[in-house]
Amino acid sequence: MSSAAENGEAAPGKQNEEKTYKKTASSAIKGAIQLGIGYTVGNLTSKPERDVLMQDFYVVESVFLPSEGSNLTPAHHYPDFRFKTYAPLAFRYFRELFGIKPDDYLYSICSEPLIELSNPGASGSLFFVTSDDEFIIKTVQHKEAEFLQKLLPGYYMNLNQNPRTLLPKFYGLYCMQSGGINIRIVVMNNVLPRSMRMHFTYDLKGSTYKRRASRKEREKSNPTFKDLDFLQDMHEGLYFDTETYNALMKTLQRDCRVLESFKIMDYSLLLGIHFLDHSLKEKEEETPQNVPDAKRTGMQKVLYSTAMESIQGPGKSGDGIITENPDTMGGIPAKSHRGEKLLLFMGIIDILQSYRLMKKLEHSWKALVYDGDTVSVHRPSFYADRFLKFMNSRVFKKIQALKASPSKKRCNSIAALKATSQEIVSSISQEWKDEKRDLLTEGQSFSSLDEEALGSRHRPDLVPSTPSLFEAASLATTISSSSLYVNEHYPHDRPTLYSNSKGLPSSSTFTLEEGTIYLTAEPNTLEVQDDNASVLDVYL
């Protein structure tokens, strides 16, 4: 499925322009779809319900609808055509799994004319949307329809295990035959609701090779941008609360592994972004063609069809991203890197591409010219890993838990420093008390040492006594362990040492001259921050 056609916008002012597909007018295709589905679903309701068997996946029912009508079919003004239904019982089970009742299915498709979307895909497929905005109908190629038939048993098993998925939800596969032309169509879920304006739409593959919207695409009213455009516009990515982010990545990982097991690659993530802040400021002009059927929009008929349901999200507004709003249409709440509130709508599209021989050849010749890891077409395992890495690292990001503000940190650190400093001061004060008492006790020995030194000056025949190495080491240890600090602003050329001891301020001086240590003490006139401080000067 092409992302360009998923914008959910009908062609404004071009209702009279008739398009053709395989030389068949689009109006004839729409009419045949409604007539054929109306007949086959109505006929299926008469069959008893039973378990799906393996052979049911390969059953093809056919009915001929002539323009003049028949006993089983109504008359119509389109050319005669034959309508085929593939695996009707299997698809009936799929519809029941998603809560789609036969009456609702018929009402959505057959009650009102189908709306043709203005943006056809690169493959030239036609896209129609039902008037109630529930279903997308797309024309597919023969190989795509054939691949979907082969995929059905595994698809059935996967849906049983995980009905909540971002993979396309297929509700029917049909074929219209007229004039020797086969037109195959598939009915799927509508990823982007038309009633919610998409300010940006992206088709993301995780590739960089030619992944930028063309000039022609950019000129459209609602262009679909690509990977390089996203990296330029949303370079910081999209942010989710932790719970939503984990649910989204878990769903993407599981879906990619399923596609890898089916050898599917070249798929895309169709991403629609709605800015809530913009929608509050702007008044969107809605015409009856852009507004879904008011009779049916009171409730969502299809289960697991919204983006929020598809990722197993709880539907809560995490981390204050978005307030409870009934008009969110099931979008996933997120924020831009600028803090803007967003609603995201997404789904994996274009899964009917298997890694067949032609794709292998396409990758081979592209890899010869360009970097093989950057091209879109790649082997399924590498494609899945690259796709997930791109989504996880460049597109979707988790909002980190709020950290404490700097002011709070500063207050806490100051309080801690105050408490620590009080403990240190108290400890130093007690230590200095003890050491001061010891120094005063030892002062007498220093006094006698002074007298001996003075006497030696008058008696040159005597050699001044010097303290032993043990005493000198003891003194050095006492001074170094006293937790002193230096005041460089002391008005002398010598450094001054302080301690926080109680008592009157005083100054004591140790002087080493000619191998003799002198201790002098004098009152301290220096203003110290602590009233109970004393000064100890050491001159060496």
From Swiss-Prot:
Enzyme Commission number(s): 2.7.1.68
Broad enzyme group: transferase
Listed GO MF terms: 1-phosphatidylinositol-3-phosphate 5-kinase activity; 1-phosphatidylinositol-4-phosphate 5-kinase activity; 1-phosphatidylinositol-5-kinase activity; ATP binding; phosphatidylinositol kinase activity
Described purpose of this protein according to its UniProt entry: Catalyzes the phosphorylation of phosphatidylinositol 4-phosphate (PtdIns(4)P/PI4P) to form phosphatidylinositol 4,5-bisphosphate (PtdIns(4,5)P2/PIP2), a lipid second messenger that regulates several cellular processes such as signal transduction, vesicle trafficking, actin cytoskeleton dynamics, cell adhesion, and cell motility. PtdIns(4,5)P2 can directly act as a second messenger or can be utilized as a precursor to generate other second messengers: inositol 1,4,5-trisphosphate (IP3), diacylglycerol (DAG) or phosphatidylinositol-3,4,5-trisphosphate (PtdIns(3,4,5)P3/PIP3).
Annotated GO CC locations: cytosol; endomembrane system; plasma membrane; uropod
Keyword line: ATP-binding, Cell membrane, Cytoplasm, Kinase, Lipid metabolism, Membrane, Nucleotide-binding, Phosphoprotein, Transferase
Species for this entry: Homo sapiens
Residues modified to Phosphoserine: S445, S447, S448
Species classification: Eukaryota, Metazoa, Chordata, Craniata, Vertebrata
Name of the protein in question: Phosphatidylinositol 4-phosphate 5-kinase type-1 beta
Tissue: Detected in heart, pancreas, brain, kidney, skeletal muscle and lung.
Subunit structure: Interacts with RAC1, AJUBA, PLD1, PLD2 and ARF1.
Stored InterPro entries: PInositol-4-P-4/5-kinase_C_sf, PInositol-4-P-4/5-kinase_core, PInositol-4-P-5-kinase_N, PInositol-4/5-P-5/4-kinase
Gene3D superfamilies for the chain: 2-Layer Sandwich, Phosphatidylinositol Phosphate Kinase II Beta
Limits of the PIPK domain: 25-395
Location in or out of the cell: Cytoplasm, Cytosol; Cell membrane; Endomembrane system
Annotated GO biological process: phosphatidylinositol biosynthetic process; phosphatidylinositol phosphate biosynthetic process; regulation of phosphatidylinositol 3-kinase/protein kinase B signal transduction
